Amino acid sequence: MPVRPGALRLEAVHKRYGRAPEVLAGVDLAVAPREIVVVAGPNGSGKSTLLRIAAGSSRPTSGRVRGRAPVVGYLPDRFSAQLRMPAAVYLRHLAALHRENAAAAAESAGELLEALGFVGSTRTPMSGLSEGNAQKVGLAQALCCSAGLLVLDEPWSGLDAPAAQVLLGRVAAAAQDGASVLVTDHTGTAAALPRARHLRLQGGELRPSPPQPNGPAPLVVVELWCPLDPAQAAAALAPFVRAAPAGDRLVLHVPVGRSDALLRAALDLGCSILSVTPAARDAPR
């Protein structure tokens, strides 16, 4: 396929550990700006190795990587949660490494942690956080650094349903804002990402994955209060979603991949977001 300017490119990448068989056997991959690539594959197939090389934390045995963005937001497969420093200090440290404004980065990370349902205090040492909260800190450091390349290894692992929906929206928004996005996912959640390209890594080679099931995308239910008439608000938001006035409130059913755009549009209208919850599987569409 043609490679767009600014794309991350892995060219004939091989990776071998010692005398073991090759983990990657001549992988070619391009991830363009505003593109999402989802890599699946069995355990031990080399997905994490592929992402480490893409992010720059590991080198290929042979082959080369070109076009890597100057700032990479990277969530590794084993995010280090054994640090003694408080989570807030860790996030400030990563922001400084990425040359981000400290105050702006802290605000952005705090907003994302709240949206993901982080429980407790960021003054708690990383080693004292639960696995789920540590994962959310890892996501915050990766997603809040204005990265041109986003590399996320199993980002939905350990997240509850509401947090998973929030992450879907943030990943889609990062691509919309111009980032190249490369993720792995064994939960099936990434199937809801809009316009993502799905690949499978097996036997050291990348191949297009079988087509995803054609069922409807998962929905979230958004409840709003808007300063204008609910019917007018519903009409204004109609391009995004099916909307239904409910008294002085507005209840909307939106595909998860479009929820971030809808929430931005609602805030632009002056609406208050009352709740965002996963829709029941048998909810009307």
What are the functions of these language-model segments?
Residues 78, 83-99:
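Q-loop/switch helix immediately C-terminal to the Walker
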Residues 92, 104-121:
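Conserved ABC ATPase "signature" region
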Residues 139:
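Hydrophobic anchor residue at the start of the ABC signature
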Residues 150-154:
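Catalytic Walker B motif of ABC-type/P-loop ATPase nucleotide-binding domains
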Residues 40-42:
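The feature captures the beta-strand-to-loop junction immediately N-terminal to the Walker
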Residues 1-28, 33:
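A short, flexible loop at the N-terminus of ABC-type nucleotide-binding domains that lies
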Residues 55:
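Helix-to-loop junction immediately C-terminal to a conserved catalytic motif
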